[in-house]
């Protein structure tokens, strides 16, 4: 049940968040110990975050600390007080569109906070840092599918820029201090206990309340929707794959997908982009209701399409996401109706 045959002590940041909650539950279910931190900020309903925590906290091998990543002293205490076998860093100020309107809030969590994570790993000998990047780093790229071997130097939102910065910072610490770091570019994650600011959640709520849904770029959009269980499986497997320096890396022909340092990047996505209008049709069928639609132009910071090249992930850990949206949306709707009693 436990790869390597022993129970690990794992720090999970953003443990009350959508992905962090599911990662913590998987680790605990498989016999590991989890120390979770989260600042429980009001970016979206803190009650949902507390309910997630309540379900994680029922396991005796879980310890929670309410803490902001930007709190340098608090973060130093966390690392000094425990010996971690791995850090899974999932905390961040999320939201592409939110970063356009509120740029300053992204600095503390996504940049300063990430530096504190790197410093903790450096000074306390953490064997592996796994951190969340994002498909948004591909920015203005139009070559499909998006590959980790492509350059990602043209972000179109501050959120994407902070995630790209995280990748650069992690690589720097891997190169300077030998800290094994793995970044995971998540592609449009959805599923039970999801974020209320994400499309599936907002569409579901609006349709059930009889309100219109906003559809950008007049519906001409595609997303590589990736079900939460597939994301968690990828994170879990990668956690046990500690990266090593690639002796074949050539600085005269630098490949972004590998490195002379113990640093790697992987996409986690299904490689099957779904048209937004089809996604909505599947949701309408699952809800048994039709949506009233507001057709709007493409928003700043948004992109028309995403599609993951997950071949590197599959080659590394023998897994690629596979839950179809028809199944994933049905599971989400069942959870939503049960949780909100509608």
Role assignments for model-derived ranges:
Residues 1-189, 239, 319, 331, ...:
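N-terminal Rossmann-like NAD(P)+-binding domain of SDR-like oxidoreductases, especially those catalyzing
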Residues 165, 169, 173, 203, ...:
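Hydrophobic alpha-helix immediately C-terminal to the catalytic Tyr-X-X-X-Lys motif of short-chain
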Residues 205-342:
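C-terminal substrate-binding subdomain of Rossmann-fold SDR/epimerase-dehydratase oxidoreductases
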Residues 193:
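Conserved GTPase G-domain signal focused on the G5
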Residues 49, 71, 199-200, 231:
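Amphipathic coiled-coil/heptad-repeat helices and related helical stalk/stem segments
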């Amino acid at each position: 049940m436990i790869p390597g045959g022993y129970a690990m002590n794992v720090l999970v940041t953003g443990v009350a968040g959508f992905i962090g909650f599911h990662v913590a539950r998987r680790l605990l279910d498989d016999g590991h110990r989890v120390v979770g931190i989260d600042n429980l900020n009001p970016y979206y309903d803190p009650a949902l975050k507390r309910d997630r925590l309540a379900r994680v906290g029922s396991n005796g091998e879980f310890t929670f600390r309410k803490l902001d990543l930007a709190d340098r002293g608090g973060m130093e205490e966390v690392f000094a007080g425990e010996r971690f076998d791995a850090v899974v860093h999932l905390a961040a100020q999320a939201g592409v569109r939110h970063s356009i309107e509120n740029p300053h809030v992204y600095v503390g969590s996504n940049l300063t906070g990430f530096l504190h994570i790197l410093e903790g790993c450096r000074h306390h000998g953490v064997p592996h840092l796994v951190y969340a990047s994002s498909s948004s780093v591909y920015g203005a790229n139009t070559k499909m599918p998006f590959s980790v071997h492509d350059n990602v130097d043209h972000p179109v939102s501050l959120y994407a820029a902070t995630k790209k910065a995280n990748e650069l910072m992690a690589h720097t610490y891997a190169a300077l201090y030998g800290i094994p770091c793995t970044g995971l570019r998540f592609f449009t994650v959805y599923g039970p206990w999801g974020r209320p600011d994400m499309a599936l959640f907002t569409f579901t709520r609006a349709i059930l309340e009889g309100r219109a849904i906003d559809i950008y770029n007049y519906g001409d959009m595609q997303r590589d929707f990736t079900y939460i269980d597939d994301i968690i499986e990828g994170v879990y497997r990668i956690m046990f794959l500690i990266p090593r320096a690639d002796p074949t890396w050539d600085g005269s022909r630098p490949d972004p997908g590998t490195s002379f340092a113990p640093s790697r990047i992987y996409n986690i996505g299904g490689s099957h982009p779904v048209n937004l209008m089809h996604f909505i049709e599947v949701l309408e069928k699952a809800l048994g209701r039709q949506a009233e639609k507001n057709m709007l132009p493409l928003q700043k910071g948004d992109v028309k399409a995403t599609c993951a090249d997950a071949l590197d992930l599959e080659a590394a850990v023998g897994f690629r996401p596979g839950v179809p949206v028809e199944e994933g949306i049905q599971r989400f709707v069942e959870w939503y109706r049960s949780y909100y009693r509608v």
